[in-house]
Amino acid sequence: MKHYGEYKNLFSKLYEESQIQLDAKMSEHIYFKVGGPVDILLTPNSIQQVKETITICKENNIPFYVIGNGSNILVKDGGIRGVVIKLCELNKIECIGNKIIAECGALLKDVSKAATEGSLAGFQFACGIPGSVGGAVFMNAGAYDGEISFVIESAEVLDDNQEIRIIPKSELNLGYRQSVVMQKGYIVLRATFNLVNGDKEKIQARVDELTKRREERQPLEYPSAGSTFKRPEGYFAGKLIEDAGLKGFAIGGACVSEKHAGFVINCKNGTAKDVLDVIYHVRDEVKKQFGVDLYPEVRIWGED
């Protein structure tokens, strides 16, 4: 605990002791398994708790960061000053007719499972995406020719005025790895997905097919944040990186995956600096060789 010990009492009035972690290792909360500690990590179990937590942070000028499953975040080795609000406990999933209503912390694989069990088609693409609903809506996550914009009906968000709003799909401005939620810094609380009735066996078969493909082609045995770079227009990041001769390129304990060049992985107990050094080298080398700019898809937080 570094800078915000004086604020613990503020959060203690709102949280049980078990929901508060001081000087929490962020490496235990993100998929990359790297990064320094955060001053305070809070795990709310209700939307009201989330709202009140952010009010406290804003009133006391405490920096705060919101995570779901930590699958698309890299925390630097110096850690995070302030508060991390982890939404994993807000994970209810409800099926009503051909709609699924899921809270922000629900895992995409669990939403996909619920859809399959309810014989609802359209969410199979997300069966292997390791993120949560909140993060998926935030960045319009996608895979295997599917994305959130294809299935979402609306998102319930906490806006920058601490008001809860329901934003219809038409106003979410969903594009490639972007949304109005990202642009305005809103926090996703729930999402409603509009699916179609289908044949359960066929839906499961598609899930199985995508799961097998992912296992065969991606380095799932190593910590990573999935695809490291956004897809540059007209290209594939992994192909550019491979063509640049960077498969297997390593710095310290991080490297470009031999299995899929689009993944930077923590292959030998690396540090956040190792991961970032690999990312920046890959970016610079692809620019040098092909004149193409690569931008990280992973979000980078914290201090060096």
Swiss-Prot record:
Alphabetical UniProt keywords: Cell cycle, Cell division, Cell shape, Cell wall biogenesis/degradation, Cytoplasm, FAD, Flavoprotein, NADP, Oxidoreductase, Peptidoglycan synthesis
All residue ranges annotated as the FAD-binding PCMH-type domain in the record: 33-198
SUPFAM superfamilies: FAD-binding/transporter-associated domain-like, Uridine diphospho-N-Acetylenolpyruvylglucosamine reductase, MurB, C-terminal domain
Known EC number: 1.3.1.98
Function: Cell wall formation.
Name of this protein: UDP-N-acetylenolpyruvoylglucosamine reductase
Superkingdom per UniProt: Bacteria
Active-site residues annotated for this sequence: 177, 227 (proton donor), 297
Any one of the GO BP annotations: peptidoglycan biosynthetic process
Pathway(s) annotated for this protein in UniProt: Cell wall biogenesis; peptidoglycan biosynthesis
Catalytic activity, as annotated: UDP-N-acetyl-alpha-D-muramate + NADP(+) = UDP-N-acetyl-3-O-(1-carboxyvinyl)-alpha-D-glucosamine + NADPH + H(+)
Signal peptide feature range: none
Cellular-component GO terms for this entry: cytosol
Entry's localization field: Cytoplasm
Main location: cytoplasm
Annotated coiled-coil segments of the chain: none
NADP recorded as keyword: yes
First-level EC class: oxidoreductase
Similarity annotation: Belongs to the MurB family.
Cofactor: FAD
GO molecular function terms listed in the Swiss-Prot or TrEMBL record: FAD binding; UDP-N-acetylmuramate dehydrogenase activity
